[in-house]
């Protein structure tokens, strides 16, 4: 579900795969496209994620899965979560580094992904001040809630080059079609497996309420 989409987002932000696909689709000279591709491919070059530093804000179920998967892809993973549960902590790879503050994530990481709930305290937590603390050319991913990011500050960070790419699952007028932003139409749980799991979870919760009175 969401974990796979986050990993895909990192890959799409690292290499201009989307641009390459669009070039192939719109190139009119299909007869010689194989030779043209060799000449044009340089403009779609990027970097590998292996060896890069990934900062994960929020190590709940999804954040922990992203962290573990990223280590298998060769990334150096940093996690920040002052409220991490015991279960989540036990499930984390030992190679994941514990960050004591958000500033550590901002200053050290090439990629940052957010996995926290939207509350009064987290609303627009990624603001102008946060962007100034990040590395130049950082890639920011948001598959949690759109309002976690101050989009006005985000646009400024993109225009200045502070942020290389912003990848999000929440389309709106500010981000849709804007250079430097990759937007998917809320696809996080749009898989056959996720929908089935949601249905099973709903049945279990109803049964727990009827049998035990738990809400």
Summary of predicted features, one role per range:
Residues 176-179, 187-215:
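NAD(P)-dependent dehydrogenase/reductase Rossmann-like domain
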């Amino acid at each position: 579900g969401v974990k796979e989409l986050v990993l895909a987002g990192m890959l799409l932000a690292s290499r201009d795969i989307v641009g390459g696909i669009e070039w192939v689709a719109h190139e009119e000279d299909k007869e010689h496209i194989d030779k043209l591709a060799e000449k044009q491919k340089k403009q779609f070059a990027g970097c590998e994620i292996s060896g890069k530093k990934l900062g994960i804000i929020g190590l709940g179920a999804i954040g922990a899965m992203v962290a573990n998967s990223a280590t298998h892809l060769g990334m150096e993973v940093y996690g920040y979560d002052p409220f991490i549960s015991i279960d989540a902590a036990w499930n984390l790879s030992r190679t994941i580094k514990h960050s004591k503050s958000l500033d550590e994530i901002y200053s050290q990481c090439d990629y940052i992904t957010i996995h926290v709930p939207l509350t009064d305290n987290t609303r627009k937590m990624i603001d102008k001040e946060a962007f100034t603390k990040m590395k130049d050319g950082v890639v920011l991913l948001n598959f949690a809630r759109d309002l976690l990011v101050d989009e006005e500050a985000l646009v400024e960070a993109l225009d200045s080059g502070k942020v290389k790419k912003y990848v999000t699952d929440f389309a709106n007028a500010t981000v849709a079609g804007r250079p430097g932003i990759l937007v998917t139409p809320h696809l996080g749980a749009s898989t056959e497996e996720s929908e089935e799991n949601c249905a099973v979870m709903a049945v279990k919760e109803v049964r727990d309420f009827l049998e035990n009175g738990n809400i």
